[in-house]
A protein has these predicted regions:
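Conserved acidic donor-binding segment of nucleotide-sugar-dependent glycosyltransferases
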Residues: 312-320, 326-333
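Nucleotide-activated donor-binding/catalytic signature segment of Leloir-type glycosyltransferases, i.e.
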Residues: 238-263, 268
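Membrane-proximal helix-turn-helix segments that form the acceptor-binding/catalytic region
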Residues: 130-150
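Aromatic "clamp/platform" in nucleotide-sugar-dependent glycosyltransferases that forms part
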Residues: 277
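Conserved donor-binding/catalytic core segment of Leloir-type glycosyltransferases
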Residues: 12, 194-213, 219-222
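Active-site donor-binding segments of glycosyltransferases and PAPS-dependent sulfotransferases
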Residues: 24-101, 253
Length: 370
């Protein structure tokens, strides 16, 4: 009897524009799961020439790794890559672009949009960033016609993208993501506050230095009022020389942390403090929910979509609102309160294999609309 061999669907991955910390960690969780899917094969992976992903090694000998070298400043090189040089990615094998901006290429193209700054009204918090993303939005709109499918992480991001580019209605699909692989493997769970001798809150904000991450919001805390805040430590993952308010003794800047150090920080924290003004998803929110931690975050659509009524919200334009939220958390914890995230986590995939399969299903025309 002849055994039937199932044909594997070929796909190409475009990663040349993946640079941000959160985006890199997301791709590092996805790549091994893409490779493990038996129904698909990675024909080619286009890698950046610098950064962590440039050193990626595939476990599959059939996959061709192609390093995209840049000889011009990144912004100019990206513009050319997505327009005049887009034909480099022509081909009959579907292309899954994991870096936000479509390329002008003759192929079946699916684009995973991670940055919320492509949506109208999103703010970087500074003029230079606004110019950069105005150009990115122009380029995105210019190449929309080359894309079959867009993937986003939340319904809020889907709505924002369609509001900005109405012509893509019907082409946008939502695929949420779980916590990063390294955190899932840690099995860390928190069900109560740690018992300590000090009474202040230990807060953790894991975010790189980008304007929309809003570290500068902490500048408004007055040194002579610092002791009024019920906080013993706020841990920021930014360099000490970028400390937004060195006069506040309980703000500690520890620079970028390796995954094992992030896990340790979550073990010690009483809550996640999230300050970001704009997110397509907000991985730290998912991380904190998965662990079981309380969350203080801005009262913005991206946060409401994920956290529902379990988070403690504040007005991101009002420092006193943040202070009230922190006091509220302190009082709740003192009374024995702890959040219950089980309902919120029901919309989050259980693992990265589900996410990888859903993405490649859409990229090869086998996925269903969200």
């Amino acid at each position: 009897m002849t055994e039937h061999v199932r044909e594997r669907k070929a796909v190409r991955l475009h990663l040349t524009n993946i640079a941000g910390l959160g985006a890199v960690q997301l791709i590092q969780s996805l790549l091994p799961n893409f490779e493990r899917l038996l129904d698909y094969k990675l024909e080619a992976v286009y890698l950046p020439s610098r950064g962590e992903l440039s050193n990626y090694e595939t476990a599959c000998h059939e996959t061709k790794l192609i390093c995209y070298k840049r000889y011009l400043p990144n912004s100019i090189s990206r513009l050319l890559e997505c327009t005049l040089f887009g034909s480099k990615f022509d081909g009959t094998t579907p292309l899954l672009v994991l870096g936000d901006i479509p390329v002008r290429s003759k192929t079946k193209q699916t684009v995973f949009v991670q940055t919320p700054l492509l949506a109208q009204g999103a703010s970087t918090g500074r003029q230079l960033g606004a110019i950069k993303y105005w150009i990115a939005r122009w380029l995105f709109k210019l190449n929309i016609g080359y894309v079959s499918t867009f993937i986003v992480q939340t319904e809020a991001m889907k709505a924002a993208l369609i509001d900005t580019y109405p012509e893509i209605i019907g082409r946008v699909h939502v695929i949420a993501q779980p916590a990063p692989l390294w955190l899932l493997e840690s099995q860390l769970k928190r069900t109560q506050r740690n018992i300590r001798t000090d009474s202040g809150l230990r807060l953790f904000y894991p975010a790189a230095v980008y304007p929309h991450k809003n570290h500068r919001f902490l500048r408004a805390i007055q040194a002579d009022r610092a002791n009024v805040w019920p906080v013993s430590e706020l841990l920021l993952t930014i360099p000490e020389n970028l400390n937004p308010n060195p006069a506040i003794a309980w703000i500690h800047c520890v620079d970028r942390l390796a995954p094992d150090k992030v896990i340790k920080a979550y073990e010690n924290a009483d809550a996640l403090l999230f300050l970001s003004l704009s997110e397509s998803f907000g991985f730290p929110l998912v991380e904190a929910m998965w662990i079981g931690l309380p969350i203080i975050c801005p009262d913005l659509p991206y946060a409401r979509t994920l956290c529902g009524n379990q988070a403690i919200y504040f007005n991101p334009e009002d420092l006193n609102s943040l202070y009230v939220a922190v006091v509220n958390l302190s009082e709740r914890l003192d009374s024995g309160w702890w959040p219950e995230w089980s309902e919120n986590l029901k919309v989050i995939p259980r693992n990265w294999e589900e996410v990888a399969a859903a993405m490649l299903g859409l990229a090869t025309d086998e996925g269903e609309a969200a």
